Regions:
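Regulatory nucleotide-sensing modules
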Residues: 1-18, 22
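Residue-level recognition of specific faces of alpha-helices
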Residues: 16-19, 50, 63, 101, ...
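Cyclic-nucleotide recognition modules
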Residues: 37-96
């Protein structure tokens, strides 16, 4: 994908699972037609999909866009299903992958409502330090649910 190109577009059914070999992909949704809210940024060696859309075959509620030129290995859902029925090890891998993604989403959801902005910031620094080295701070502040100004203050305090 080239910078700015979409892997998933809000309103379209996501039929692909991707693996990021290199680059950065931003998961975001638009609120009130103009306000982008970043939910995650994937770096290399991660899988990407709009899971709700991909699994349930419904229109995506989020966008996944390349923040940088990116190399993505893509597999169609029908091919994933075929491989699962043909290769038991692939099925086991796929189940573990989806379980891991669901746990990450659940943890993120709970952390967002139970932790303070400072606690979320510290946790993200520990769990994903590369984000702070590679991703523009505007996306990190959006992921944390705070303004760029608040993030700047947190960085000075911590």
């Amino acid at each position: 994908l080239t910078k700015g190109e979409y892997f998933v577009k809000e309103g379209k059914v996501a039929t692909q699972l991707g693996f990021v070999e290199s680059g950065q992909l931003q998961f975001y949704t638009t609120v009130n037609q103009y306000d982008e809210r970043t939910t995650y940024v994937s770096l290399e060696n991660t899988f990407v999909a709009s899971l709700l859309s991909y699994i349930n075959e419904v229109p995506a509620r989020e966008n996944i866009r390349a923040l940088t030129d990116s190399v993505i290995w893509i597999i169609e859902k029908k091919d994933v299903c075929n491989l699962q029925s043909q290769i038991s090890a692939f099925k086991d891998f796929y189940i573990k992958l989806i379980e891991y993604q669901l746990c990450c989403i659940d943890k993120s959801r709970l952390d967002f409502i139970t932790l303070s902005a400072q606690e979320r910031y510290l946790q993200l620094q520990i769990q994903e330090p590369r984000l702070f080295q590679e991703v523009p701070l505007q996306y990190i502040s959006s992921m944390l649910g705070i303004s760029p100004r608040h993030l700047s203050r947190l960085r000075k305090v911590v």
